[in-house]
Structure formats: structure tokens, C-alpha cells
Amino acid sequence: MFREKWYEWKNWREMVHTTWNPKDPGAVRIHLIPPKFQLFRFVPSVAILNGNQIIPVNESWAILLTEFIRQLNTFGDGEMPEEALEKILENTCRNVKKVYPDVDPEELLEDLETITGVFEDVARGREPEIEIGQMDIGTYASYMTAPHRMDLMVSSMEKDGRWNCNQHCVHCYAAGQTYANDGELGTDEWKQILKRCRKAQIPQVTFTGGEPTMREDLCELIKAARWFITRLNTNGVRLTKEYCKALAEAELDNVQITFYSSDRNIHNRLTGSDYFEKTVEGIQNALEAGLSVNVNTPLCRDNKNYRETAEFLKSLGVTYVTCSGLIPAGNAAKDAQVSMRLSEAEITEVVRETVEYCAKNGMELSFTSPGWIREEALREMGLDVPSCGAALSNMAVTPSGDVVACQS
């Protein structure tokens, strides 16, 4: 135990990160996050793949993986020749044997092959050949040093006394919340926040608002956040071909676009705008630019024809969709909007019908609102059960730089 703990004390002051096959469509982003130091206890580390799959990694494998990632990162970009890989593996084994001197290098290489195989399988949605443990974030929380995601509200709802969004969504959870109307930080100030997030070992940041594309420096901020898994939440209105190209060049990992309905009138009514066509074009432009796209739909009585919306999105080339109930905050907490919420039975049926369509048509659907649909019903549909991660797996930074438990 002494050697392991000495290694942890010296080497696990920050997470390690690398990308396998960075120029390939099947690239795998890995953030290995060590736990809080525990002198007399073995605690697993956490590997986060592409910002969403969380895998517990036992102590010895975490040490092996740490050394392998550090050696990989000395190589740089480009195709790796065989002799370079051999040198990386040789150095990895030599460093790990300082902690485990009695372990045969061949055993270390076999373990490393197993680890990388599991990560490849999980990242690509395949069943791993070995059983991996389950990670309950609530149980693991006491060993975490920081949340796994920080939502950066880079754009406020009001600016200089004027509305600062290109839509007026009737269910907007940010509208009317005091912190959403704070003054915005400048470019350099947000870059400092990114540095602090990295130092705190937070692997993922989401650029949100308000409407983050209202900022002229958004692509610059995303580019400055390349070390993280980066996501963008937007209404899609400003996603022109040129803008999407700039997002791709900034190496944005994922864009979530809010789309209420394939019915033009319903979508425009719920967004309080006349931008249905621009939003559809934004989805198409993001896909054409090679961005990873998911389309989110907050469900209510007006747009419960969700299956038709999924069919429409399928025709655009969208393969991943998410849906939710109405978040009871901001505008959505007003009496008129509360009356538009679907009952548990109604939203369950809407989701069930759409899940069946998606399963038959090569689409993936996730439901993201905890407590709206019973766990048994979600499992019966083959969906993951959502949970609230506020102040646990995620937190948020307001437009003025304050840290809050959740942006909604």
C-alpha cells in the first residue's frame, strides 16, 4: 500500500487527459479523474469517455492508465509509428514497476490491452468483454474533488437594459431569474474561469445562456476550452454554414439544439418568434459541418405530437434526440405555463410512442427530467433513469461569474 499511496500523493494532483485517434470520426476523449487522497483506503478513480460515459477504474489500473496517458501525450499529433508505440509502452511499464516491482511487464501490457479494449467498446456502444462496475455518483460524491460538468452561462437574458435573446420562448426557465440578468463577463474573464475549472479537475464545460451565440467571442471561448469536453446549448437560429464551420474549427464536441415541433406554427408559437426555418437550417448546417448534434424538445400540451417531430428530424439526418418535461423555473413557473404541462400518464405515452419509432428507425432517445416518468416505465422502455446532478455532478457559473448549484 505504501508505494501506491506515495505515487498518488506525488502524481494525482490533477487529472490526466488524452484523445485516441484525434483525427478519426471515432475519436475517444478520455479524462481520468483521481479521487480525494485517502491514506488508508483504496478508492477507484473515474474515467470519463467523450464527456458522458463514466467508468470506475481500480487503483492499480488507474496508476497504469495514468502513466500510459502521460507517455502518449509526449508523442504529439500525427500517425504513430510502431517504434514510437513500443517506446511508449516500455516507458509506461518501467514507471509502473516502480510502484509494483514484482509484476511482470507482460502482465502490465495485458492489463493495458484490456483497459483500452473496454474503453473502445464503451465509447462505441458495444458490450465490453469483461464486466465493469457501476458508478453511483451519489455514493462516490464524498471522494470527488469537483463536479464533472460546469455550465457556463456566458450570455445573459438582458443586456444594457434590453432583451438579449433572439427568441422569446414561453417556457424559458432562465427568463425572469435574477442571476440570468446579471452583467456579462468579458472574454479574458471567461478564459480565467476556464483555467480555474481545469485546475479544479472539471472535465466538461457547457456553453449556455441565455442564448450563447449572441456573444461574438463564443468560438474564441470554445477554442480556449479545447482541453475540456465542450458542449453548446443553443436555439440554432444563428447556426449558419460559416458559423458551424467556425465551431468545428474550434473543436466543439457537441451541440444541443432546442426544437419544439415539426409543425411550424407550434414551434414559432412556443418560441415567440418566426424562426422555424432558421432553426431547421441550423440543424442541417451543424450536421453538414460534421458536428455531433443532438436535438432537445421540452414537451408540453402544444407539442405532444413528438413522434411526428422525431420523424421530421430523422429526415434531416438527426440520429440522437432528447426530450424533457417543462422545468418549473423562470417563465415555465407562471400559471399559464404550468397549465400546459403534461400529466405523468400523458408524457409517458408520448415518450413511449416516440421511443418505439426511434428504435425501429436507427435513432436514440433520452429522457432527461427526473421524477416525471416512473422508473419502472422508463426501464420498460429501455431508457436510462435521469437524476438531478445539481451541486453533485454539475454546477453552473452565472453571466457575472458567480457559482450556483444549477442554472435552472
Where on the chain are the PLM-derived regions?
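Accessory C-terminal segments flanking Radical SAM cores
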Residues: 25-67, 82, 369-408
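Flexible, glycine- and charge-enriched loops at secondary-structure boundaries
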Residues: 105, 162, 179-190, 269-276, ...
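Conserved alpha-helical substructure of the radical SAM core
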Residues: 100, 107-115, 122-123, 128-250, ...
